[in-house]
């Protein structure tokens, strides 16, 4: 029998042990974590809609009409008209023929990928894709080939060497780096080599593109270019759940084949009603997005002036690259001492030697909030200097 306690201790010794913070109250920039009020820069609530009044009122109004629980799977008696309205709304929002509502983004990726590929097929996956994509690839039992991050030329070479059914899967916005996939080039090579392109736009929906419709539409691509679009509703949209959007045939096929859709209880229908209201806020949220963009630019300019290493990202995800696990944890603790919550991200979430602080900005933040973060980063800069001083001479 494996010694689980020993494995946990090894994680602690490597600076990889993870703990949960106990949050009280609503998700908003200033929240209560473990009983302490902190200004948070680690939420994915990019537009500040998680506690939006109209969305909560829509939920309250729907509850007496539809009840609380989903009660059954969608293919038994759990597919409520509220779910159906949301799917129609998501199809229109993404400019696609149909959409299918999943309980979580993880379930959407696992269910879609394992339904669209199997033994004898080949999946091509960006090396920095999300864990749910990786697990979907494993579950499919297809052959999996990983291409270097964003390297379309390398992908095209792989595609040219491969026959049979081919699936190319990529994040639209990469969750730990904040950069955007080269979607136009990916669509081109997939068409040229008869490969089905799947884009998980979990971190693009709500933030990028016309009226927040995501990275695919921002790139000027349509359903024909990107046949399979996956998105989540718990980030930019501010509620919960996920979806896949595409052709009528695709959605019908997934209803028949996606096990994570078939064999689970439907999400609460009242939540679907609240999500429809939130999509209205997303579509009318150009001022929110403009404010968010201004905050991103303000943070980047200030952090770079302080000498911090940032990644090339124009999205709300702004990683501060550290490298060493312990140094990342120390900087996170130093910021918390200043009343800020900024999480250290370590392997296996990111590659070895690439630990970082993942700063995420929200339209609910103010300029004063960002300035407070920058002041704390300036005060905590000595943490990095001390780490460099501890490094052994070569």
Curated annotation (Swiss-Prot):
The keyword Aminoacyl-tRNA synthetase is annotated on this UniProt entry: no
Leader peptide range in chain numbering: none
Domain of life assignment: Bacteria
Known pathway: Cofactor biosynthesis; biotin biosynthesis
Keywords: Biotin biosynthesis, Pyridoxal phosphate, Transferase
Alphabetized InterPro entries for the sequence: Aminotrans_II_pyridoxalP_BS, Aminotransferase_I/II_large, AON_synthase_class-II, AONS_Archaea/Proteobacteria, AONS_Proteobacteria, PyrdxlP-dep_Trfase, PyrdxlP-dep_Trfase_major, PyrdxlP-dep_Trfase_small
Residues that hold substrate according to the record: 18, 130, 349
Keyword Nucleotide-binding: no
Cited PROSITE patterns: AA_TRANSFER_CLASS_2
Cofactor (UniProt): pyridoxal 5'-phosphate
GO biological process, any: biotin biosynthetic process
Annotated function: Catalyzes the decarboxylative condensation of pimeloyl-[acyl-carrier protein] and L-alanine to produce 8-amino-7-oxononanoate (AON), [acyl-carrier protein], and carbon dioxide.
Family: Belongs to the class-II pyridoxal-phosphate-dependent aminotransferase family. BioF subfamily.
Name of this protein: 8-amino-7-oxononanoate synthase
């Amino acid at each position: 029998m494996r010694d689980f306690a020993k494995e946990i201790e090894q994680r602690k010794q490597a600076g990889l042990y993870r703990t949960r913070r106990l949050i009280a109250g609503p998700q908003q920039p200033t929240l209560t974590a473990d009983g302490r009020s902190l200004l948070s820069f680690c939420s994915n609530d990019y537009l500040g809609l998680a506690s939006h009044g109209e969305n909560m009122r829509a939920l309250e109004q729907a509850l007496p009409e539809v009840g609380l629980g989903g009660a059954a799977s969608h293919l038994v008696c759990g597919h409520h008209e509220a779910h159906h309205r949301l799917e129609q709304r998501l199809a229109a929002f993404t400019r696609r023929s149909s959409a299918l509502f999943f309980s979580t983004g993880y379930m959407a990726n696992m269910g879609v990928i394992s339904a669209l590929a199997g033994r004898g097929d080949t999946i091509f996956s960006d090396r920095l894709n999300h864990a749910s994509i990786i697990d979907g690839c494993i579950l499919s039992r297809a052959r999996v080939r990983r291409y270097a991050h964003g390297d379309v030329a390398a992908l095209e070479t792989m595609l040219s060497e491969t026959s049979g059914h081919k699936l190319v899967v990529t994040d639209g916005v990469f969750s730990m780096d904040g950069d955007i996939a080269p979607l136009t080039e990916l669509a081109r090579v997939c068409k040229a080599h008869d490969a089905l392109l799947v884009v998980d736009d979990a971190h693009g929906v709500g933030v990028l593109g016309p009226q927040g419709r995501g990275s695919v539409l921002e790139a000027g691509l349509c359903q024909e270019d990107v046949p399979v679009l996956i998105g989540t509703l718990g980030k930019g949209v501010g509620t919960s759940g996920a979806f896949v959007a595409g052709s009528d045939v695709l959605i019908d096929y997934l209803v028949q084949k996606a096990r994570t859709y078939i064999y689970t209880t439907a999400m609460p229908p009242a939540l679907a009603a609240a999500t429809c209201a939130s999509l209205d806020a997303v579509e009318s949220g150009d001022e929110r997005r403009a404010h968010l963009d201004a905050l991103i630019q303000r943070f980047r300019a200030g952090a770079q002036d302080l000498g911090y290493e940032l990644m090339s990202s124009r999205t709300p995800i702004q990683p501060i690259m550290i490298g060493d696990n312990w140094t990342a944890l120390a900087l996170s603790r130093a910021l918390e001492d200043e009343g800020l919550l900024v999480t250290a991200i370590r392997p296996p979430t990111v590659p070895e030697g690439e630990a970082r602080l993942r700063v995420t900005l929200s339209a609910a933040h103010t300029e004063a909030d960002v300035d407070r973060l920058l002041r704390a980063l300036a005060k905590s800069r000595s943490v990095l200097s001390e780490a460099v001083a501890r490094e052994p001479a070569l």
